[in-house]
Amino acid sequence: MLMPKRVKYRKQQRGHNRGMAHRGNTVAFGEYGLMALEATWMTSRQIEAARRAISHHVKRGGKIWIRIFPDKPVTAKPAETRMGSGKGAVDHYVAVIKPGRILFELAGVRPEVAHEALERAAQKLPIKCKIVPREDLEGAA
């Protein structure tokens, strides 16, 4: 599972997830990317399930980049516990996803294989996604 090695502060407030992604919204490393179309908190388990789906489909070929990392701690209190007596312990970590964010990238495989692998990954995720090709900058030399 993905989680930070060490953190400055153990617990965080929830915050608001508004607006579009301004960072990480272009395919930077691979040839194809999986773009989020909705806002969500994505758990490390969901990210791992999607990664496994891609890896299983491309077998030994290709390279996968995971462009998101779960660095936000989510706390939970034990079941059947009365309210009060402080904030609960850290239960798991999530990545905050905004619309337009590239989640995974893939390179080194045929276009139809990449498309199918990313579609299988998208089915494992709690949001709608779309597959985007890399847009190489024209005339940038």
UniProtKB/Swiss-Prot annotation:
Q: Which CDD domains match?
A: Ribosomal_L16_L10e
GO cellular component terms, A-Z: cytosolic large ribosomal subunit
Q: Tell me the domain of life.
A: Bacteria
* Single GO MF annotation: rRNA binding
Keyword RNA-binding, does the record have it? yes
One Pfam family hit: Ribosomal_L16
Please give the biological process terms from Gene Ontology that the record holds: translation
Region Disordered, as annotated, extends over 1-21
InterPro entries in alphabetical order: Ribosomal_uL16 (IPR047873), Ribosomal_uL16_bact-type (IPR000114), Ribosomal_uL16_CS (IPR020798), Ribosomal_uL16_dom (IPR016180), Ribosomal_uL16_sf (IPR036920)
Keywords, alphabetical: Ribonucleoprotein, Ribosomal protein, RNA-binding, rRNA-binding, tRNA-binding
Function comment:
Binds 23S rRNA and is also seen to make contacts with the A and possibly P site tRNAs.
Q: How does it assemble?
A: Part of the 50S ribosomal subunit.
Similarity annotation: Belongs to the universal ribosomal protein uL16 family.
Give the matching PANTHER family.
Answer: 50S/60S RIBOSOMAL PROTEIN L16, LARGE RIBOSOMAL SUBUNIT PROTEIN UL16M
Query: What is this protein identified as?
Result: Large ribosomal subunit protein uL16
What is the phylogenetic placement of the source species in the record? Bacteria, Bacillati, Chloroflexota, Chloroflexia, Chloroflexales
